[in-house]
Amino acid sequence: MGKRILVQRRGRGGSQFRSPSWKRDGPVRYPPNISGRGIVVEILHEPGLNAPVAKIRMENGVEFFNYAAEGLYVGQVIQVGPDAPPAVGNVLPLGKIPEGTMVFNVEKRFGDGGKFARSGGTYALVIGQRPEENKTIVRLPSGRVIEVDARGRATIGIVAGGGRVEKPFVKAGKKYHRARAKSWKYPTVRGKAMSPYAHPHGGGSHQKGGTPVPKTAPPGQKVGFIGSRCTGRGCVRARAQQKQ
């Protein structure tokens, strides 16, 4: 008799697979209908997030969390709203931001709190305005160019914490604590190293690569490389030749 494989257990959504949001001080998002001046009260480390978080208190007493911009400091005064100057740390509507400005925590839809360019060291670039359509053209960190609502908000600057991926984990224990903060399953066992009852790639007198599952397979059946461009030993070599 077979057993539920890891993909199926994760899809069920048990507590060990849920991100521990209760360990954080609050969601990192813009509050609705807010403008004015505020002050950076504290810069926090939030478990599971890969960038520092700034706690901002507005003049009316409203507090919210936003990713800290590179160079932001405790006690700095920031401004929020359409009348704010495009200075580092200020939050403005995209339609009021000059072309060529680096921004982060960009709203996909007006009022959603911020969806794009939220990782440490990343930024999006405002490359154009279409006031007649109330749209702003933004280049994302991936290089993709999109149009978003010009009323959507963004923060001026670059997310702090750049260079994080350049520092190696060195020890498996560090990787364990990182995975635990984000509820990743760690360490992960290769499917082809399992028994046949535990994984579709398991079993056999010797290990061999599994057959990729089709993209049309239902959830719970998708294992291994999903939609891979190439597999096998020559895969890395083929990608290197394509780049050249």
Swiss-Prot record:
* MF GO annotations: rRNA binding; structural constituent of ribosome
Q: Which is one Pfam family of this protein?
A: Ribosomal_L2
Which InterPro entries does the entry link to?
A: NA-bd_OB-fold, Rib_uL2_dom2, Ribosomal_uL2, Ribosomal_uL2_arc_euk, Ribosomal_uL2_C, Ribosomal_uL2_dom3, Ribosomal_uL2_RNA-bd_dom, Translation_prot_SH3-like_sf
Q: Name one GO biological process term.
A: cytoplasmic translation
Q: Does the keyword NAD apply?
A: no
Q: What SUPFAM superfamilies is this protein classified in?
A: Nucleic acid-binding proteins, Translation proteins SH3-like domain
- One GO cellular component from the entry? cytosolic large ribosomal subunit
Q: How does it assemble?
A: Part of the 50S ribosomal subunit. Forms a bridge to the 30S subunit in the 70S ribosome.
Role played: One of the primary rRNA binding proteins. Required for association of the 30S and 50S subunits to form the 70S ribosome, for tRNA binding and peptide bond formation. It has been suggested to have peptidyltransferase activity; this is somewhat controversial. Makes several contacts with the 16S rRNA in the 70S ribosome.
* PANTHER family for the chain: LARGE RIBOSOMAL SUBUNIT PROTEIN UL2, RIBOSOMAL PROTEIN L2
Q: What is this protein called?
A: Large ribosomal subunit protein uL2
